[in-house]
Amino acid sequence: MAVPKRKTSPSKRGMRRSADALKAPTYIEDKNSGELRRPHHIDLKTGMYRGRSVLPPKD
Protein backbone atom coordinates (compact mmCIF):
# COMPACT_ATOMS: atom_id res chain seq x y z
CA MET A 1 0.00 0.00 0.00
CA ALA A 2 1.31 3.45 -0.89
CA VAL A 3 2.13 5.70 2.05
CA PRO A 4 2.86 9.44 1.68
CA LYS A 5 6.41 10.43 2.58
CA ARG A 6 5.37 13.89 3.86
CA LYS A 7 2.26 15.31 5.51
CA THR A 8 0.05 17.25 3.09
CA SER A 9 -0.15 20.89 4.18
CA PRO A 10 -3.56 22.57 4.57
CA SER A 11 -2.70 24.82 1.63
CA LYS A 12 -1.98 21.89 -0.70
CA ARG A 13 -5.09 20.08 0.51
CA GLY A 14 -7.20 23.19 -0.15
CA MET A 15 -5.74 23.63 -3.64
CA ARG A 16 -6.56 20.02 -4.45
CA ARG A 17 -10.14 20.42 -3.22
CA SER A 18 -10.72 23.76 -4.95
CA ALA A 19 -12.19 22.03 -8.01
CA ASP A 20 -14.64 19.93 -5.96
CA ALA A 21 -17.20 22.71 -5.36
CA LEU A 22 -20.42 22.68 -7.37
CA LYS A 23 -20.74 25.56 -9.78
CA ALA A 24 -24.05 27.12 -10.81
CA PRO A 25 -24.91 26.48 -14.48
CA THR A 26 -24.37 29.41 -16.84
CA TYR A 27 -27.26 30.79 -18.88
CA ILE A 28 -27.25 33.42 -21.60
CA GLU A 29 -30.09 35.37 -23.16
CA ASP A 30 -30.71 34.28 -26.75
CA LYS A 31 -30.41 37.13 -29.26
CA ASN A 32 -33.36 36.04 -31.41
CA SER A 33 -35.97 34.78 -28.94
CA GLY A 34 -34.86 36.45 -25.71
CA GLU A 35 -35.12 33.10 -23.90
CA LEU A 36 -32.48 31.87 -21.48
CA ARG A 37 -30.39 28.95 -22.72
CA ARG A 38 -27.07 27.25 -22.01
CA PRO A 39 -24.10 28.50 -24.04
CA HIS A 40 -23.14 26.25 -26.99
CA HIS A 41 -26.56 24.53 -26.86
CA ILE A 42 -29.57 24.56 -29.18
CA ASP A 43 -32.36 27.03 -28.37
CA LEU A 44 -35.23 24.58 -27.91
CA LYS A 45 -37.91 27.23 -28.49
CA THR A 46 -36.70 28.30 -31.95
CA GLY A 47 -34.59 25.24 -32.83
CA MET A 48 -31.68 27.45 -33.87
CA TYR A 49 -27.97 26.88 -33.24
CA ARG A 50 -25.31 29.32 -34.45
CA GLY A 51 -27.73 31.00 -36.85
CA ARG A 52 -28.93 27.77 -38.48
CA SER A 53 -32.17 25.87 -38.00
CA VAL A 54 -31.36 22.47 -36.46
CA LEU A 55 -34.74 21.40 -35.06
CA PRO A 56 -38.30 22.28 -36.00
CA PRO A 57 -39.47 25.16 -33.73
CA LYS A 58 -41.80 24.36 -30.83
CA ASP A 59 -45.18 26.06 -30.74
Curated annotation (Swiss-Prot):
Residues 1-59 are annotated as: Disordered. Pfam families: Ribosomal_L32p. Residues 28-44 have a biased composition (Basic and acidic residues). GO terms for molecular function: structural constituent of ribosome. InterPro entries: Ribosomal_bL32, Ribosomal_bL32_bact, Ribosomal_zn-bd. It comes from the Bacteria. Signal peptide: none annotated. GO terms for biological process: translation. Keywords: Ribonucleoprotein, Ribosomal protein. One of its GO terms (cellular component) is large ribosomal subunit. The keyword Ribonucleoprotein applies. The keyword Ribonucleoprotein applies. Residues 1-16 have a biased composition (Basic residues). NCBIfam families: rpmF_bact. Belongs to the bacterial ribosomal protein bL32 family. This is Large ribosomal subunit protein bL32. It comes from Bartonella quintana (strain Toulouse).
